Amino acid sequence: MGLRTAKKRGLGGGGKWKREEGGGTRGRREVRPACFLQSGGRGDPGDVGGPAGNPGCSPHPRAATRPPPLPAHTPAHTPEWCGAASAEAAEPRRAGPHLCIPAPGLTKTPILEKVPRKMAAKTPSSEESGLPKLPVPPLQQTLATYLQCMRHLVSEEQFRKSQAIVQQFGAPGGLGETLQQKLLERQEKTANWVSEYWLNDMYLNNRLALPVNSSPAVIFARQHFPGTDDQLRFAASLISGVLSYKALLDSHSIPTDCAKGQLSGQPLCMKQYYGLFSSYRLPGHTQDTLVAQNSSIMPEPEHVIVACCNQFFVLDVVINFRRLSEGDLFTQLRKIVKMASNEDERLPPIGLLTSDGRSEWAEARTVLVKDSTNRDSLDMIERCICLVCLDAPGGVELSDTHRALQLLHGGGYSKNGANRWYDKSLQFVVGRDGTCGVVCEHSPFDGIVLVQCTEHLLKHVTQSSRKLIRADSVSELPAPRRLRWKCSPEIQGHLASSAEKLQRIVKNLDFIVYKFDNYGKTFIKKQKCSPDAFIQVALQLAFYRLHRRLVPTYESASIRRFQEGRVDNIRSATPEALAFVRAVTDHKAAVPASEKLLLLKDAIRAQTAYTVMAITGMAIDNHLLALRELARAMCKELPEMFMDETYLMSNRFVLSTSQVPTTTEMFCCYGPVVPNGYGACYNPQPETILFCISSFHSCKETSSSKFAKAVEESLIDMRDLCSLLPPTESKPLATKEKATRPSQGHQP
């Protein structure tokens, strides 16, 4: 759902999107301003391997086999598709664990079995489920896969240079083995050996502004509010849903998510859910801090912050020990709207400061907290349950594209861009014109967790007449309180600078929502392959059509099967994908359609294999990140391995992707992670596929509309190739031989 001079992942600590933050929400962001001129300076939303997925079909027996590393293209000799290594990012199943873990010292993958529904129903919450620790992949396996992933993306001369550097790094008794041993020791001592490194690299070290660069948005179906009261009733119902959902979290009553698709039934780590309403991203001069509001000293927050006309109000949701009813919330919201309309009482739009670069916002906050009034106001915001932003009409047509832009950046200072507080993890936007959704600060949780929460809230809103838990009304409701600010000339200067930078971000974003309606995942499943793998190959073909090359690609893969797992990266720009896209474009006439079909199968099979590798903890990105950070701490200089241009290039994710399927009418979107890149978030539905494509106007090489057109052409071409496959042959590849699994590395 989720960026960008030269402090790239290989040199600096900063990064987002998968991953993207991505994410996704997406790939780690090159630290460069979204608008190129902005000073300072992610993210997928949906996550492959998350709590659910497209059921697809049984995987090809080799789909779960760790390629040693990804093999060069060998034409398939069977007409069947590879089975679906599901991207697993839709409605999750709620179930429990059934793990068979090898004895200590063995390096095989844990046997993660499917869990029968009856057994799943009896399982405890994830905290009690005994999830395994994230394994440490074998060093030589990671190094070999890294070279294989990059060989076809760099020149032969550059590859030979990088190969020699990698061989030296991984030599027996060398630095690589020393760092690997340190990592194994870290694994023994921590719940998750990569989580701290990943959080800092993906998000907290990133100095870019949060809007577009890091924070994804979920856009609801357009609402129709004939009057202001209708808008407020919707907001009141949404707040009521938040309180009900938070009560479930507080009592640990939410069943454990379990994976669908590949290795279905495995329980998933639920820790991220408990950061939905208790997290706050505190700006820092060089690194942000993710604050969790779980103090035993401070009382549990019982208020929501409402933003209206760029003003901020405290809405207490518990008064006299009673939770406000939906009717009470509506009454209080009406008071807030009336108070906000009093222009004589309006204060400067302090929320703008949170849209600035993180170092700039940290500097401004240092000035703000010198005054006790400002400290009190900041404290109320930082400890709130969530924000609810009552937006003014955006003044544009209410297409999917324009509504998404309102969520991503608010339209800038002149519209709703200042009616936000980007540091808070969840901001629910309820616009007077029916534009509604949620803006997410991505560091505490991944896209699928946000989707699960949001779908619960929307179901609550639509069924509130039956599900609302009503408390007795409080006869005398005290008026909500306006937060006060004292702004020095220095703060006024920061506000002016923040407003100008936000306008640059708004003008620079090239964004389009495109619905492909020729077919959806139903057709793809009939081909006996994973919808996610199919779409990923289509994205590679689309990019190659426009730019005649492939680039490092990021697709979020959930590793919530393990303790405190977040995401790793599926590197979708495989050698097999390159062979296929060249056959379809460069050699269109020379390669017969039947051979193109075989190449397509190989590309999907390679994508599927890497997906399984990633969701079982065997991908390379997190492993290399941890080795790099250990080297940074141990060595006077960063090893040549992590200064090499191939490594730096491998972490500039020109194509940042994430699958975020939904079961209700909504979709997710985010910005690119590098200045010359694309963000591509997609939502596969039975008969359609919705794409949110983003890029930057300042890059003359990219165009979101052209990319969307190329995606359409690619999906149609792939459908036409599928028509060559007789219906009787449309079945999974043979599954007689026993599936093998990738080496699971060192087990705790």
Curated annotation (Swiss-Prot):
<comment type="similarity">
    <text>Belongs to the carnitine/choline acetyltransferase family.</text>
</comment>
<dbReference type="InterPro" id="IPR039551">
    <property type="entry name" value="Cho/carn_acyl_trans"/>
</dbReference>
<dbReference type="Pfam" id="PF00755">
    <property type="entry name" value="Carn_acyltransf"/>
</dbReference>
<keyword id="KW-0530">Neurotransmitter biosynthesis</keyword>
<keyword id="KW-0225">Disease variant</keyword>
<keyword id="KW-0597">Phosphoprotein</keyword>
<feature type="binding site">
    <location>
        <begin position="520"/>
        <end position="532"/>
    </location>
    <ligand>
        <name>CoA</name>
    </ligand>
</feature>
<protein>
    <recommendedName>
        <fullName>Choline O-acetyltransferase</fullName>
        <ecNumber>2.3.1.6</ecNumber>
    </recommendedName>
</protein>
<feature type="modified residue" description="Phosphoserine">
    <location>
        <position position="473"/>
    </location>
</feature>
<dbReference type="GO" id="GO:0005634">
    <property type="term" value="C:nucleus"/>
</dbReference>
<feature type="compositionally biased region" description="Gly residues">
    <location>
        <begin position="40"/>
        <end position="53"/>
    </location>
</feature>
<feature type="binding site">
    <location>
        <position position="659"/>
    </location>
    <ligand>
        <name>CoA</name>
    </ligand>
</feature>
<dbReference type="InterPro" id="IPR042231">
    <property type="entry name" value="Cho/carn_acyl_trans_2"/>
</dbReference>
<feature type="compositionally biased region" description="Basic residues">
    <location>
        <begin position="1"/>
        <end position="10"/>
    </location>
</feature>
<dbReference type="GO" id="GO:0007274">
    <property type="term" value="P:neuromuscular synaptic transmission"/>
</dbReference>
<dbReference type="InterPro" id="IPR023213">
    <property type="entry name" value="CAT-like_dom_sf"/>
</dbReference>
<feature type="compositionally biased region" description="Basic and acidic residues">
    <location>
        <begin position="17"/>
        <end position="32"/>
    </location>
</feature>
<feature type="active site" description="Proton acceptor">
    <location>
        <position position="442"/>
    </location>
</feature>
<feature type="region of interest" description="Disordered">
    <location>
        <begin position="727"/>
        <end position="748"/>
    </location>
</feature>
<feature type="binding site">
    <location>
        <position position="558"/>
    </location>
    <ligand>
        <name>CoA</name>
    </ligand>
</feature>
<dbReference type="GO" id="GO:0006836">
    <property type="term" value="P:neurotransmitter transport"/>
</dbReference>
<feature type="modified residue" description="Phosphoserine">
    <location>
        <position position="125"/>
    </location>
</feature>
<keyword id="KW-0808">Transferase</keyword>
<dbReference type="GO" id="GO:0005737">
    <property type="term" value="C:cytoplasm"/>
</dbReference>
<dbReference type="GO" id="GO:0045202">
    <property type="term" value="C:synapse"/>
</dbReference>
<comment type="function">
    <text>Catalyzes the reversible synthesis of acetylcholine (ACh) from acetyl CoA and choline at cholinergic synapses.</text>
</comment>
<keyword id="KW-0012">Acyltransferase</keyword>
<dbReference type="GO" id="GO:0006656">
    <property type="term" value="P:phosphatidylcholine biosynthetic process"/>
</dbReference>
<dbReference type="GO" id="GO:0043005">
    <property type="term" value="C:neuron projection"/>
</dbReference>
<feature type="compositionally biased region" description="Low complexity">
    <location>
        <begin position="73"/>
        <end position="89"/>
    </location>
</feature>
<keyword id="KW-1004">Congenital myasthenic syndrome</keyword>
<dbReference type="GO" id="GO:0004102">
    <property type="term" value="F:choline O-acetyltransferase activity"/>
</dbReference>
<feature type="compositionally biased region" description="Low complexity">
    <location>
        <begin position="54"/>
        <end position="65"/>
    </location>
</feature>
<dbReference type="GO" id="GO:0005829">
    <property type="term" value="C:cytosol"/>
</dbReference>
<feature type="region of interest" description="Disordered">
    <location>
        <begin position="1"/>
        <end position="89"/>
    </location>
</feature>
<dbReference type="GO" id="GO:0008292">
    <property type="term" value="P:acetylcholine biosynthetic process"/>
</dbReference>
<dbReference type="InterPro" id="IPR000542">
    <property type="entry name" value="Carn_acyl_trans"/>
</dbReference>
